Amino acid sequence: MQPPPSLCGRALVALVLACGLSRIWGEERGFPPDRATPLLQTAEIMTPPTKTLWPKGSNASLARSLAPAEVPKGDRTAGSPPRTISPPPCQGPIEIKETFKYINTVVSCLVFVLGIIGNSTLLRIIYKNKCMRNGPNILIASLALGDLLHIVIDIPINVYKLLAEDWPFGAEMCKLVPFIQKASVGITVLSLCALSIDRYRAVASWSRIKGIGVPKWTAVEIVLIWVVSVVLAVPEAIGFDIITMDYKGSYLRICLLHPVQKTAFMQFYKTAKDWWLFSFYFCLPLAITAFFYTLMTCEMLRKKSGMQIALNDHLKQRREVAKTVFCLVLVFALCWLPLHLSRILKLTLYNQNDPNRCELLSFLLVLDYIGINMASLNSCINPIALYLVSKRFKNCFKSCLCCWCQSFEEKQSLEEKQSCLKFKANDHGYDNFRSSNKYSSS
């Protein structure tokens, strides 16, 4: 026996009302409707099923731009959790990322090849040529060794990670890669600072004419540079971890600085990281170089009238070394400026609730990717800069790379002897000059 039609209609209406009420109740309790969940993009990091974690860095802006905006407190129902309104998604950053994926791969491969050849050749030149083993060149060798360590370990892993999109290694490699990268940058920064100070000391004390070999103070400087760089890179190894990301129905593993840190120090480090990197790893070497090179210029102008003709060759050598160090600092500044500029602009100008944020976000992402490529170039460009600026390094590079002679040692042996004899002759002439001035003044 079938129920009356009126009863069927009433039951259907009651069922529809019940479904509607349950849907409204679910939305008020924080459960989103079926079609209200925003499309997850590549930078949205989630810990299933309810919590969303955002990475810190250039892609974090993309993730936050696609995240739901929070409703003001005045519009919430008392006792209910915050509801969100989805802002319109930005499509430009996705296309930018796909474009720069291949550009970054080509640049990284170029840096890998040039960096290994250039830095290895530079280390070999300083090791084989005895007259090249002085204080500034040993610091340059330390800088090249740090760059070589970064090139051999970090660049292949970063290229593989960029193409695979999913982190293919374990948590140990996730911590090791940023640790080595930050230690390498620290070695570069502190080595440039030490070179600038060394050039001022060389000009300020004309009597401090060095022979062949590594001074003890330079060896202590190198040890301190490496120890301090490693210590300052430890927070990177502590803070980085693997996070699971829900993307289009599949889970991806991403290596990044974890948004939730366990200690108060690491939470502060995560918050102030961009400003710390900008101040210590960028502004510090530029400020120290500007300060000591200003003092060095004033010292050279003050003592120029009292110089002897016999010291002209030695003075030219010191000026060439000073010019080389200044060129290395200038290359460092040009390579790292776009990356630091993009991070600082992101911190100061970007607002995820701004309706015009997509244009600014696209510009910042382009600047960030350009900065990443230029920062990678800094690992291989120092040998090229030395080749272009220093005549001695240029001759050594030609002899070692182009094989213009049968043996590098055979060709350089005569030049080494002549250079050393000339160096000692200038030293002897300067001693005679000092003794004559001493007796004349007495």
UniProtKB/Swiss-Prot annotation:
Recorded GO MF terms: endothelin receptor activity; peptide hormone binding; type 1 angiotensin receptor binding
Membrane topology: Multi-pass membrane protein
Keywords: Albinism, Cell membrane, Deafness, Disease variant, Disulfide bond, G-protein coupled receptor, Glycoprotein, Hirschsprung disease, Lipoprotein, Membrane, Palmitate, Phosphoprotein, Receptor, Signal, Transducer, Transmembrane, Transmembrane helix, Waardenburg syndrome
GO annotations of cellular component type: nuclear membrane; plasma membrane
One Pfam short name: 7tm_1
Summary of the tissues where the protein is detected: Expressed in placental stem villi vessels, but not in cultured placental villi smooth muscle cells.
Result, substituting residue 156 to R: Found in patients with Waardenburg syndrome 2; likely pathogenic; loss of cell membrane location; new cytoplasmic location
Residues recorded with modification Phosphoserine: 305, 419, 440-442
SMART domains, A to Z: 7TM_GPCR_Srsx (SM01381)
Keyword rRNA-binding: no
Cellular localization per UniProt: Cell membrane
Disulfide bonds: 174-255
Lipidation (S-palmitoyl cysteine): 402-403, 405
Region feature Disordered, mapped onto this chain: 69-88
Annotated glycosylation sites: 59
Residues exposed to the Cytoplasmic side: 127-137, 198-218, 297-324, 390-442
Xref: CDD domains: 7tmA_ET-BR
One example of a Gene Ontology biological process annotation: cell surface receptor signaling pathway
Extracellular side: 27-101, 164-175, 244-271, 351-362
Xref: InterPro entries: Endthln_rcpt, ETB_rcpt, GPCR_endothelin_rcpt, GPCR_Rhodpsn, GPCR_Rhodpsn_7TM
Recorded consequence of changing residue 17 to P: Found in patients with Waardenburg syndrome 2; likely pathogenic; loss of cell membrane location; new cytoplasmic location
Family: Belongs to the G-protein coupled receptor 1 family. Endothelin receptor subfamily. EDNRB sub-subfamily.
Disorder noted: Waardenburg syndrome 4A: A disorder characterized by the association of Waardenburg features (depigmentation and deafness) with the absence of enteric ganglia in the distal part of the intestine (Hirschsprung disease).
Function summary: Non-specific receptor for endothelin 1, 2, and 3. Mediates its action by association with G proteins that activate a phosphatidylinositol-calcium second messenger system.
Annotated PANTHER family: ENDOTHELIN RECEPTOR TYPE B (PTHR46099:SF3), G_PROTEIN_RECEP_F1_2 DOMAIN-CONTAINING PROTEIN (PTHR46099)
Protein name (database record): Endothelin receptor type B
